[in-house]
UniProtKB/Swiss-Prot annotation:
This is Histone H1.2. Residues 120-133, 174-191 have a biased composition (Basic and acidic residues). Residues 44-118 form the H15 domain. Belongs to the histone H1/H5 family. GO terms for molecular function: double-stranded DNA binding; nucleosomal DNA binding; structural constituent of chromatin. The gene is His1.2. One of its GO terms (cellular component) is nucleosome. One of its GO terms (biological process) is nucleosome assembly. Residues 1-53, 101-250 are annotated as: Disordered. Residues 27-42, 151-161, 192-211 have a biased composition (Low complexity). It is found in: Nucleus; Chromosome. It comes from the Eukaryota. The keyword DNA-binding applies. Residues 1-11 have a biased composition (Polar residues). It comes from Drosophila virilis.
Length: 250
């Protein structure tokens, strides 16, 4: 009796374990199709926001682009079914008008014509990814480190060159000072020699100049030629002709 009771009590436990294994297997089977959905091919066209903005920008209509024109442009350029994307396009148009990105020139809702606002016409700069930012930071830090190393090396070189210049300039300064001292001594010696010699030369000059008496120089006055103011010209005197025949006839 006891053995039969143990067998009956153990049988429901085994049944529960088997049912638990079945549930786990069904959960795993249900999880597998999700992974298949995640591996689905990405869409061949860009998001609707980008397609609508590009279509309005490239159509360049003065009165604004209509919904039909936007659909035709999207279907022709991106080669996708514009009818399936129509609800997404309408939703974006309404939100863009509310946000101020698009201007509705005609109609109401999504059935009118639309133009890009001035802020939307400017091409937005693409945001840099986190990886690019990290690489830029790493490159900047590396560049700073190299700059610091180069600056320290240059400062060390400059300090060494300055020390060398100082060591070279020190003896030159001493030699210059010695030369200056020698020149000053020579100048002093010259000054003392000239002061002593000056009175002797002055005495010699005075003795030499005293006996000499300057002789008055007399220039012989040359007789000046007297030029007569009016020199009388010699007048030719006519001689009287000898009376010959007339005198004898009388």
């Amino acid at each position: 009796m006891s053995d039969s009771a143990v067998a009956t009590s153990a049988s429901p436990v085994i049944a529960q374990a088997a049912s638990g294994e079945k549930k786990v297997s069904t959960k795993k089977a249900a999880a597998t199709p999700k992974s298949k959905k995640s591996t689905a091919a990405p869409p061949s066209h860009p998001p609707t926001q980008q397609m609508v903005d590009a279509s309005i920008k490239n159509l360049k209509e003065r009165g604004g682009s209509s919904l039909l024109a936007i659909k035709k442009y999207i279907g022709a350029t991106y080669k996708c079914d514009a009818q399936k994307l129509a609800p997404f396009i309408k939703k974006y148009l309404k939100n863009a008008v509310a946000n101020g990105k698009l201007i509705q020139t005609k109609g109401k809702g999504a059935s009118g014509s639309f133009k890009l606002s001035r802020s939307a016409k400017k091409d937005p700069k693409p945001k840099a990814s986190a990886v690019e930012k990290k690489t830029k930071k790493v490159n900047a830090s590396a560049a700073r480190a190299t700059k610091k190393k180069s600056s320290t090396s240059t400062t060390k070189k400059a300090a060494g060159a300055a020390d060398k210049k100082l060591s070279k300039s020190a003896p030159t300064k001493k030699s210059v000072e010695k030369k200056r001292a020698d020149k000053a001594k020579a100048k002093d010696a010259k000054k003392t020699g000239t002061i002593k010699a000056k009175p002797t030369t002055a005495k010699a000059k005075s003795s030499a100049t005293k006996p000499k008496t300057p002789k008055p120089k007399t220039k012989s006055a040359k007789p000046k030629k007297v030029v007569s103011a009016t020199t009388p010209k010699k007048t030719a005197v006519k001689k009287p002709k000898a009376k010959t025949a007339s005198a004898t006839k009388k």
